[in-house]
């Protein structure tokens, strides 16, 4: 598993969901976690630097998760940062759109700690983290 000091940004407009993901990450040994409530908030934090991984919801106000993902992939400084989409959008076309936009992984809500751990593990393995 990756460096436990890796800094995560959890992006979701629903504070309860952010807390759930934060707690699951903590269970996996990742305590360096910050939160953002939408894509605009997330971008401001990401541009300030220091993050190594983004876990983002899809449906959010101001800037949705797919737009955030595309913006991250278009930014030279952040383009290689892993982005895991965690969303209620289970439709095949959503999963394809996220993959085409460069998502590192995709988890459909609701999910278990084991599912999150498995997805993170696959991303870390693929990136050699």
Curated annotation (Swiss-Prot):
Record-annotated Response regulatory domain positions: 7-124
Subcellular location: Cytoplasm
Cofactor comment: Binds 1 Mg(2+) ion per subunit.
InterPro entries noted in UniProt: CheY-like_superfamily (IPR011006), Sig_transdc_resp-reg_receiver (IPR001789), ST_Response_Regulator (IPR052048)
SMART domains tied to this protein: REC (SM00448)
Residue positions where N6-acetyllysine is found in the record: 92, 109
Cellular component annotations (GO), alphabetically ordered: cytoplasm
Primary role: Involved in the transmission of sensory signals from the chemoreceptors to the flagellar motors. In its active (phosphorylated or acetylated) form, CheY exhibits enhanced binding to a switch component, FliM, at the flagellar motor which induces a change from counterclockwise to clockwise flagellar rotation.
Name of protein: Chemotaxis protein CheY
Organism whose genome encodes this protein: Enterobacter cloacae
Lineage start: Bacteria, Pseudomonadati, Pseudomonadota, Gammaproteobacteria, Enterobacterales
């Amino acid at each position: 598993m990756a460096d436990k000091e890796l800094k995560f940004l959890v992006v979701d407009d629903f504070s309860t969901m952010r807390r759930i993901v934060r707690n699951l990450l903590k269970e996996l040994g990742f305590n360096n976690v910050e939160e953002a409530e939408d894509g605009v908030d997330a971008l401001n934090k990401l541009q300030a630097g220091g993050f190594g991984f983004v876990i983002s919801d899809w449906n959010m106000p101001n800037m949705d998760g797919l737009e955030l993902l595309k913006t991250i992939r278009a930014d030279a400084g952040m383009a290689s940062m892993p982005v895991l989409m965690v969303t209620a959008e289970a439709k095949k076309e959503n999963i394809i759109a996220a993959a085409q936009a460069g998502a590192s992984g995709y988890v459909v809500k609701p999910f278990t700690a084991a599912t999150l751990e498995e997805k993170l593990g696959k991303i870390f393995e693929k990136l050699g983290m």
